[in-house]
Amino acid sequence: MLCLGLSGRLSRVYENSFDLPNSFMHNGAAVRVRDGRVIAAVEEERPNRIKHSNTLPIRSIQYCLASAGVQLSDIDRIAYYATEAYCNAVLERVRLSHPSTPVSDARLLQRARGGRHGLYIPVGHPDVPCDRHRHTDLAAHWTRDGTMPWRLSPALHRRDELENVGPGIDC
């Protein structure tokens, strides 16, 4: 199984489209894992040369894919370090403080931002159902208002693998 893990905000370098708190997007990074073993991992500050870069890890993703000679469509699972509920809560907070913010839904934001780079993955599409990730020690996050449950990380799974993962959640 080939997996790609991501962290970082959804803005490009030198772009701050959405005024998100720093707790929402720590340093941008990508990691490629095959059958439970880390094969490639790159923090976005390395390829873009901006210390503590928390941007969408485009170059890191490109490296992780190119180093294996694979395309995004070859990836079995993609994980992000925060739950959809947490992302939506942060985006709603931003929208309330800045009414001109165009998007307050994580899926729509991912479609708008990721699609520009050929990284859009149709969450909720029948071929890409959503399930809670069970190995969550890597994503032990919390918020003061309790919008994000401890140690939860979403992971996208292909439909034929869900039997091995357990019950899914409605995405």
Curated annotation (Swiss-Prot):
<dbReference type="GO" id="GO:0003824">
    <property type="term" value="F:catalytic activity"/>
</dbReference>
<dbReference type="InterPro" id="IPR003696">
    <property type="entry name" value="Carbtransf_dom"/>
</dbReference>
<dbReference type="InterPro" id="IPR051338">
    <property type="entry name" value="NodU/CmcH_Carbamoyltrnsfr"/>
</dbReference>
<dbReference type="GO" id="GO:0009058">
    <property type="term" value="P:biosynthetic process"/>
</dbReference>
<dbReference type="Pfam" id="PF02543">
    <property type="entry name" value="Carbam_trans_N"/>
</dbReference>
<protein>
    <recommendedName>
        <fullName>Uncharacterized 19.2 kDa protein in syrM 5'region</fullName>
    </recommendedName>
</protein>
